[in-house]
Amino acid sequence: MSLAARDDTIAAIATAVAAGAGSVAIVRISGPQAEAIGRQLFQPAGKQSWESHRVLYGHVNDPANGDVVDEVLLLLMRAPRSFTRETVVEFHGHGGLVAVQRLLELVLAAGARRALPGEFSQRAFLNGRLDLTRAEAISELVSARSRRAAELAMAGLDGGLQQRIEALRDQLLDQLCELEARVDFEEDLPSLDGAAVCTALRDVQQALDQLVLDGQQAQLLRDGLRVAIIGRPNVGKSSLLNALSGHERAIVTDLPGTTRDLLDYDLVLQGVPITLLDTAGIRSTADRVEQLGIERSRAAFASADAVVLLYDLSRGWSPDDSALRNEVPDGTPLLVVGNKSDLAAEPATTQGLAISARSGLGLAELSSALLKLCGLSGEGQGLLLALNQRQCDLAAAASAALGRSQQAARDGLPWDFWTIDLREAIRALGEITGAEITEAVLDRVFSRFCIGK
């Protein structure tokens, strides 16, 4: 898609399209022909006038045969008072799949083009309605898996992140102006305090480093954690999954090897989205089906974000438990947990936390310990603004460039050497907000949006 604003008209279904997913479906149209297409398809009831930002009631008719396609509400928003700053028409019809698909087909036949993923938001960006951080926040709000992740997305949508990045970029621009003035007119200007310039650059660098750290924590709040529960047979892995989820998700029996395949369950622990993986008990077995389950279990905990190694407190820690712990890949956060504390008398050998999946004893401590192990405090309460991965990469690149600029100062190099990396830092921050952006980057950002946004 070109960086120039488009002059064609686009359309898409803006709501879930799965059958039965909702009672209302919306077809959104944006562009210079939006109102004309609406007038061609929509027959208002009575003598309602076509006023901007007023809701009209009526029917959509097929121009080919006059058949009524759906009973709808129509919302007209004339440019520039719309999300895209183009004229926008929305048909609000009945949910399901058939009627809304037919309505979209009629809109496309009337002259609109099927919108690409994120194209409505891209037009809002290109037309100056919002900067790139706000546009990305829309996508993050839609995909938020927890309340805290949604709150962080709203902070970005409100412009907090844009203001913070622009303030840091302005500080760097001020320093660049001072340095470039000395390069061109040093004899005509008072001497520049190089130490003060370095201090200003270091302050911005430290602020960027903190934003990157916060962004990494927020990424876990957005994407969640995949946590594998592993252990020998009959240590209570399925019971723990059921206890944490609050549902009888997994079958629990006294027979070893009951769980033969991976079970997963999505939940939120202290505001953090978690996917729990209940794995087959690891042991030697001649049962081919159980062997396949064990192989899948090993693959699951090898790729998990964190591993909970569960053992039976009533039996104590064993060499088999030690062998299983050694299978966990280096660098994977590992939490050792002893289950069945309600049955344990004083076992000779213990490790890690003590819980009872049956009674619930210690589960809150387990949740907190797991999040702490992964570098998260409950719900990321200290976070006010959060960069996504693209923004983190750019902020880190800007920080590294500022480090090189300060090194040039320490090496006693002339002013113009300082400015090389300073310009790179300014460019990277501009790419975060969209002040400096390429067409390829823009396409990559908006391609991750859902269609209709």
From Swiss-Prot:
CDD domains: trmE, TrmE_N. Binds 1 potassium ion per subunit. Its EC number is 3.6.-.-. SUPFAM superfamilies: P-loop containing nucleoside triphosphate hydrolases. K(+) binds at N234, T253, L255, T258. The keyword Disulfide bond does not apply. Residues 224-375 form the TrmE-type G domain. Its main location: cytoplasm. Its cofactor is K(+). Mg(2+) binds at S238, T259. (6S)-5-formyl-5,6,7,8-tetrahydrofolate binds at R28, E90, R129, K453. It is an enzyme of class 3 (hydrolase). It comes from the Bacteria. Keywords: Cytoplasm, GTP-binding, Hydrolase, Magnesium, Metal-binding, Nucleotide-binding, Potassium, tRNA processing. Belongs to the TRAFAC class TrmE-Era-EngA-EngB-Septin-like GTPase superfamily. TrmE GTPase family. This is tRNA modification GTPase MnmE. The gene is mnmE.
